[in-house]
Amino acid sequence: MEGEERGYWRWSKRDFFPEESFQSFGSYRAALSQTCSRFKNRLVSRSDDENERFELKKQSEHEMKRCLTWWDLVWFGFGSVIGAGIFVLTGQEAHEQAGPAIVLSYVVSGLSAMLSVFCYTEFAVEIPVAGGSFAYLRIELGDFAAFITAGNILLESIVGTAAVARAWTSYFATLLNRSPNALRIKTDLSSGFNLLDPIAVVVIAASATIASISTRKTSLLNWIASAINTLVIFFVIIAGFIHADTSNLTPFLPFGPEGVFRAAAVVYFAYGGFDSIATMAEETKNPSRDIPIGLLGSMSIITVIYCLMALSLSMMQKYTDIDPNAAYSVAFQSVGMKWGKYLVALGALKGMTTVLLVGALGQARYVTHIARTHMIPPIFALVHPKTGTPINANLLVAIPSALIAFFSGLDVLASLLSISTLFIFTMMPIALLVRRYYVRQDTPRVHLIKLITCLLFVVVSSMGTSAYWGMQRKGSWIGYTVTVPFWFLGTLGIVFFVPQQRTPKVWGVPLVPWLPCLSIATNIFLMGSLGAMAFVRFGVCTLAMLLYYFLLGLHATFDMAHQQIVPRT
């Protein structure tokens, strides 16, 4: 009966598709015939703070346990970020794209990431829900924009987990004094998919299992592992500078400035894990105090650490000799510290283990909130009554991640992951500006038109700057004299002609609209620095998302919004 307590494990059709549109072939056919009108409705439909914070949480049936403090969030920041970039992508991008200037790539991507961190922090304090960027965009930019973001969040979660798990295998092999690919199974499949990785599958399964047991225990385990990893990082930095050879920094820009920005766009993945902290808001004891400390504190320290580690690697070994699969271990071996490579490999394993562990927590919470809106089946929104964790959501991310990690190489995954991350981070400052300058039923239409016009100036000029850079017209600056002034005009237009409609209650981004507009520009610029194949893969994935949306997601969310849901029995 409706309202009767049910067990967590349930597999009926109505648990996956309780919406009226899916109860029979006739009702589904009728829903498809209304696709255009339903899309128009959802395109302009926006949620609100109260709905996201209170009403949607009822879909989970049980609440998550508030057990985290700012201390936990800082270590979650370390655990989710350090490991993925430094131990996975630094060697690859230094060797192939930037050379010793990889340190500048980390500076560029770090500054851009900090701008995004500001935006995330304001939203997380104002709207402390598990959905993170998905919930924020659903409130400010509407249902369709939130869906595209949801698709990219799932893509980022699945591909990111697979990429780190593949790298885990490489470092484990190095720790055993074998080549990075020694533990993989060679096949006759096409390049990039011909090295099967069963160890990566086991690592993903273990991380998902631990994250499903208890958030508090996962936090404790992450704290211990991250502390060990931090000690290894200090060893790497100090030992790296002790064995530094400044001649390895020459030439500093072997691939030119273009290489720096291409590498920056890829190593941006190194900062992508910080958004996991925002998804912990429902489990944080004091979100308004703890989230700013956790986000801003951890990311500031991490940016400095990344730059120092990248510099130490470049000074230890010539960029042409850097091993793209296990850079630090091989670098220490090259300077005579053969024992050092084992310590570095162990630290890298610790770092990537925490990335997988914290990632499993954050990704499951994203999925939980997306499922609460019925964009994906609501069974994935359920929170287990005993563990207080979303086990079904963990499984939804872990299973496809394991399949991808089993087949796909790191180089195939990295660029696809970066463009997905950059897309989400570009949407966030746009949403923040909408939140500050537009309030439904209060903001005059003329001010809304001014805001949209100014935002178009900022976005289009940023795209123009990125495109002109991508044309590789070395020594020619005439294009920037057109695109950059338009960015300033758009930002100044917001300053002088669009009055702010909302002031943050607790913590807000400083220098609005300048910092959000700068975040838009840097993210779009970095996105444009990626290769053409990254956009092709991104386009294919986006088309797949849209196909799902128009066949399933649109009708499920329409029914949810209009309460056309069959009662659970």
Swiss-Prot record:
InterPro entries per the record?
AA/rel_permease1 (IPR002293), CAT_C (IPR029485)
Q: What does this protein do?
A: High-affinity permease involved in the transport of the cationic amino acids (e.g. arginine, and, to a lower extent, citrulline and glutamate). Transport mostly basic amino acids, and, to a lower extent neutral and acidic amino acids.
Where in the cell does this protein reside? Answer: Cell membrane
Q: Tell me what gene encodes this.
A: CAT5
Example GO molecular function term? transmembrane transporter activity
Extract one GO cellular component term from the record. plasma membrane
Residues exposed to the Cytoplasmic side: 1-67, 119-143, 214-222, 273-290, 363-389, 433-450, 499-505, 559-569
Q: Its Gene Ontology biological processes? A: amino acid transport
Q: Which residues lie on this side of the membrane: Extracellular?
A: 89-97, 165-192, 244-251, 312-341, 411, 472-477, 527-537
Q: Quick check: keyword Transport in the entry?
A: yes
Would you tell me the protein name for this molecule? Cationic amino acid transporter 5
